[in-house]
């Protein structure tokens, strides 16, 4: 199990009513987030290890929830921007062999790239502990992919803790949600 999932489960047990996510006025505590993720995992299709899944909702809460659902099902979340043109999204799905798209919590639809898993598995193996794939904004052409692995994410927690222990009253994460992860 990924460390990020273990930590989410831990906080759901130890601090269930603490805020896990807050986007504008929408607040989700650890207990309800973890429960929703577990429920969705039970009721969703099973992915092959490393299957890529596009997160394509305008709600950051929905995308984060699906992010964890995909990770718990051994998939690789791919953050796409729902403001991109259909043509751009289709090109990214084809180019990066994204097999599923999700636009609602726990609802996954196969793409035209479904079943092309074997063609890109060697690329997957080049990235140790791949956690997710994000994309640049695409202002200079087709958005470029960047890969985030789990060790780099875990390392970012030490820096986040420094901010929290300085008792900051507000923190800002400019840019797209995917870049903040």
Where are the regions that the model predicts?
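Conserved AMP-binding/adenylate-forming core of the ANL superfamily
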Residues: 9, 17-47, 148-151
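Proline-aspartate-enriched helix->loop->beta-strand connector
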Residues: 97-102
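Conserved AMP-binding A3 loop
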Residues: 29-30, 131-158
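Flexible, low-complexity linker/hinge segments
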Residues: 107-130, 147, 155-157, 162-166
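Conserved AMP-binding/adenylate-forming
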Residues: 26, 42-83, 173-176
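Conserved AMP-binding loop of ANL adenylate-forming enzymes
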Residues: 55, 163-181
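Short acidic active-site motifs
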Residues: 87-88
């Amino acid at each position: 199990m990924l460390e990020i999932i273990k930590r989410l489960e831990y906080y759901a047990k130890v601090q269930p009513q603490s805020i896990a996510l807050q986007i504008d006025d929408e607040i989700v505590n650890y207990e309800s987030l973890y429960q929703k993720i577990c429920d969705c995992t039970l009721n969703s299709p099973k992915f092959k290890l490393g299957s890529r899944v596009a997160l394509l909702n305008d709600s950051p809460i929905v995308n984060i929830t699906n992010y964890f659902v995909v990770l718990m099902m051994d998939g690789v979340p791919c953050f796409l921007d729902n403001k991109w043109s259909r043509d751009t999204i289709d090109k990214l799905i084809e180019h990066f062999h994204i097999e599923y798209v999700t636009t609602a919590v726990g609802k996954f639809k196969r793409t035209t790239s479904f079943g092309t898993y074997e063609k890109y598995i060697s690329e997957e193996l080049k990235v140790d502990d791949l956690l997710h794939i994000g994309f640049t904004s695409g202002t200079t052409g087709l958005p470029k992919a960047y890969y985030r692995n789990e060790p780099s994410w875990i390392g970012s927690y030490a820096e986040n803790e420094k901010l929290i222990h300085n008792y900051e009253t507000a923190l800002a994460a400019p840019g797209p949600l995917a870049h903040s992860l």
